[in-house]
């Protein structure tokens, strides 16, 4: 530990972040992570407490691209991350930059302005949000409305669709 910078070596999935004095928004996570636990790390820091104000990760390029996807390319992963912060692909890192080179390309992924503010402002429970989101992506070939019926119920869903003038597709 030196002034404002503190480095910790720990198992990121097992560590008690609070023991390091980290509070919501007063720390950043900057890491070269094992690619196979990217989802678990994002879930831990975005959905859990305390939350960092930002994350900068070296991740598998394809995963980073899925996270920053827009329009019709959105996924459960990209919406999950965007619900808490603003992801940005900073730079692609070719496999040749490493020795020995891995079998995949990498990318630097930054997630800024991390908070649960969107949930608090709208009075949403994080757990319920993800329940609905997962139902929406449950069956790719089905219409979103059909996927959501099991979670929200037909009557409530019809009301939402009418109120927002949504296309059933």
Task: Describe the function of each predicted region.
Residues 1-131, 135, 162:
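Catalytic cores of RNA-modifying enzymes
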